[in-house]
Design a protein with these regions (language model features):
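A short, Lys/Arg-enriched amphipathic alpha-helix followed by its capping loop at the start of a domain
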Residues: 2-7, 24-30
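Active-site acidic/histidine proton-transfer and metal-coordination neighborhood
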Residues: 3, 17-23, 60, 77-127
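Short polar catalytic/cofactor-binding loops
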Residues: 11-16
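Glycine-rich, proline-tolerant flexible connector loops at the mouths of alpha/beta enzymes
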Residues: 34-59, 107-115
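Alpha-helix-loop-beta-strand connector modules within alpha/beta enzyme cores
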Residues: 48-70, 124-127
Length: 127
């Protein structure tokens, strides 16, 4: 029954250190991480070159990423989108490098006091 199930979690809530994350997850019998934060900063803050070192460490320990835990969509729907799009593109590149099939994203913050979100639906989907 458990053969096809991948148990994963945010390991940065265990500890900021990748070494400690791996140690604890191994102890729990896990070998997948939904990587959000590693060694004190968000995965999406790393350059591709820096991320290659993280990937090497994960590979050496027999770990894989179930997904990249990103901040994509954690801006106001009314904010300028272009800088966020650049972060999205970088996150996709990181996901490919890390061989993660999935990226966790959000659906944007709606304006304060907004009770009807329907006018923003098309913009959320376009982004």
């Amino acid at each position: 029954m458990w053969d096809n199930i991948v148990l994963s979690g945010f390991a940065d809530e265990i500890d900021p250190s990748l070494d400690e994350q791996i140690r604890v997850l191994k102890k729990l019998g896990m070998n997948h991480i939904e990587m959000r934060g590693v060694n004190g900063k968000g995965l999406v803050e790393y350059t591709l070159e820096e991320a290659k070192e993280i990937k090497k460490r994960l590979d050496a320990e027999g770990f894989a990423l179930s997904s990249v835990g990103s901040p994509i969509g954690k801006i106001k729907i009314t904010d300028d989108f272009e800088p966020h799009m650049e972060l999205y593109k970088h996150t996709v590149d990181l996901a490919h490098l890390m061989e993660a099939k999935y990226i966790r994203m959000f659906s944007f913050f709606m304006p304060e006091g907004c009770e009807d979100y329907s006018p923003y639906k098309d913009e959320v989907m376009a982004r």
